[in-house]
């Protein structure tokens, strides 16, 4: 199947700055006609939630870019990446020509130089049969890279068979996988004689990234455990199987192999649970236990459900990276329309969700003349360890996107967007009353949050410009909508000033239960006895660019949001500005 064919079925994820665990978010800009013009009604979506025991309390704020920020002259997707001993990145793409103008292949090995500031150049080193085998019928399956690691100068590359077709079954099952290896930095590859994993069991494999040449492994785990390469695996498919060809993956598994023998299947051991805090390992695949299980579904219904996927499982092919300054492991997963990011103190957990970034249903917007965005997410989310800041609080996310574009450049290339994470520190609010101090401007590490932002302009509702409008139209008939901020330290507050954005025939206002919430100890708490002036009408008569003031007794928190049931037949709200005061 051609690359275009693959792009039709393989849709991307993410692209604003989301919320869930610690409540992070984003926003964009509204157009003059209804944003739901081509939408199609389906039954109302159920509210989605994760129990508090599964939510992280490690990061006070987290934000990831609304769209691609750094692009490159390359072609392809997936872009599994490692940082090698020679200080280069080695990245393997699927379905493209890589960093070359030549023919397109199902798998391409590239060496990449540069950084997000100076830009990237690359060189193609090997392609197709030079890299790995197709274990099934080549008429029905081709090769896809799922993970790569460098250890002691050797590259190990995990490759799976992924369904080609016919028709809609493409990309919906992955029955076999193996590992190729290179001792000359990617120019020559050696292959196993048979697949290492079959039957759709542990067939999406991605390696734990311990930095340059896996240099942090021994530091993080100790000399003995640091002798191994660690690999995560999914069963069935690399993401949910949109045609139910196989079961959707709900479980993330962990294995390890001696760093000199990753290609030898009989040397692998699988995480089989804990004895106290000590992991147990078994050579028997049947003994394995999941390190993370998440059965949530995103977008259980969709207004344009006949055209695009919905009811999406959240465990997918991404990456796991160790952030040494924070002593934390990050797993970057995704769905068609969201990023799903987790953190843990050890490779085996406990894994907890710290960020859901919701980009809304299609269409998305690329960067280009006349485009209202950009706002776009992507699939196969990874964090190259080479570009993690020295203090561990900023890094760059790679993901890809092709289908569902309303204009502008898509992201079918090696590209990056910035993510910023600030660890939580318990503090006491110390701000003094000041009628002019708008915490939406002056708060520490102020981070906009929302359910979703149609055009990805998260800066609009704390930029002081009351003429710009963002809205939350996202193709979902949602029960709740919100706009707000989180901070890296707590504040006293007693007033919120909300200015609406543009109104549409099918939405733009809150329909019921509009209220203020503050975040305390990572829980969102309703503020009691709030007075709204003027009275909020809960209809289209709310008015475009109209200001409402919420006054309440002094409270404190390291986050604030207005929340309620969205209005109109398309279930969305709008915003121009949100101000927060302690007066």
Predicted regions and their residues:
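Asp-box/BNR beta-propeller loop motif
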Residues: 113-119, 180-191, 260-261, 344-354, ...
């Amino acid at each position: 199947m051609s690359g275009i064919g693959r792009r039709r079925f393989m849709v991307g994820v993410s692209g604003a700055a989301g919320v869930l665990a610690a409540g992070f978010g984003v926003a964009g800009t509204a157009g003059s006609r209804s944003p739901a013009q081509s939408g199609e009604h389906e039954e109302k979506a159920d509210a989605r939630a994760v129990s508090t025991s599964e939510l992280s309390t490690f990061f006070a704020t987290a934000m990831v870019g609304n769209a691609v920020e750094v692009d490159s002259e390359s072609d392809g997707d997936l872009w599994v990446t490692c940082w090698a001993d020679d200080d280069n990145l080695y990245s393997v793409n699927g379905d493209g020509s890589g960093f070359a103008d030549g023919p397109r292949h199902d798998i391409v090995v590239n060496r990449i130089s540069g950084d997000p500031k100076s830009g990237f150049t690359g060189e193609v080193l090997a392609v197709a049969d030079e890299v790995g085998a197709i274990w099934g019928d080549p008429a029905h399956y081709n090769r896809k890279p799922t993970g790569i690691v460098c250890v002691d100068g050797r590259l190990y590359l995990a490759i799976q068979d992924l369904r080609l077709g016919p028709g809609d079954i493409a990309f919906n099952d992955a029955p076999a996988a193996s590992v190729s290896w290179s001792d000359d930095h990617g120019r020559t590859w050696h292959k196993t004689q048979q697949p290492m994993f079959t039957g759709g069991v542990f067939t999406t494999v991605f390696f734990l990234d311990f930095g340059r040449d896996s240099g942090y492994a021994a530091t993080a785990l100790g000399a003995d455990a640091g002798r191994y390469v660690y690999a995560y695996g999914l069963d069935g498919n690399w993401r949910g199987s949109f045609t139910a060809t196989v079961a959707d993956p709900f479980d993330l598994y962990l294995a390890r192999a001696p760093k000199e023998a990753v290609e030898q299947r009989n040397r692998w051991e699988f995480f089989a649970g804990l004895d106290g805090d000590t992991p147990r390992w078994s050579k028997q695949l049947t003994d394995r236990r999941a390190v993370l299980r998440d059965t949530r579904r995103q977008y259980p219904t969709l207004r344009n459900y006949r055209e695009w996927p919905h009811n999406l499982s959240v465990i997918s092919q991404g990456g796991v990276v160790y952030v040494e300054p924070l002593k934390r492991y990050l797993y970057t997963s995704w769905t068609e329309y969201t990023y799903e990011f987790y953190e843990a103190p050890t490779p085996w957990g406990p894994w907890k969700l710290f960020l859901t970034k919701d980009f809304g249903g299609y269409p998305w917007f690329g960067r280009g003349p006349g485009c209202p965005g950009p706002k776009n997410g992507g699939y196969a989310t990874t964090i190259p360890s080479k570009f993690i800041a020295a203090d561990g609080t900023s890094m760059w996310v790679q993901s890809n996107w092709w289908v569902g574009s309303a204009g502008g450049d898509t992201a079918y290339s090696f590209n990056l967007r910035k993510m910023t994470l600030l660890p939580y520190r318990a503090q006491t609010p110390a701000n003094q009353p000041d009628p002019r101090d708008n915490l939406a401007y002056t708060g520490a590490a102020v981070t906009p949050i929302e359910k979703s932002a149609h055009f990805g302009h998260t800066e609009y509702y704390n930029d002081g410009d009351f003429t710009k409008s963002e809205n939350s139209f996202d193709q979902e008939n949602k029960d709740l909508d919100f706009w707000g901020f989180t901070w890296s330290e707590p504040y006293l507050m007693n007033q919120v000033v909300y200015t609406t954005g543009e109104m549409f025939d099918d939405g733009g206002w809150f329909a019921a239960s509009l209220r203020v919430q503050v975040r305390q100890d990572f829980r969102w708490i309703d503020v009691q006895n709030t007075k709204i002036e003027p009275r909020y009408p809960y209809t289209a008569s709310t008015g475009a660019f109209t200001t409402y003031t919420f006054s309440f007794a002094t409270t404190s928190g390291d986050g604030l949001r207005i929340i309620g049931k969205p209005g109109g037949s398309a279930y969305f709200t709008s915003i121009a500005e949100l101000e927060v005061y302690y007066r």
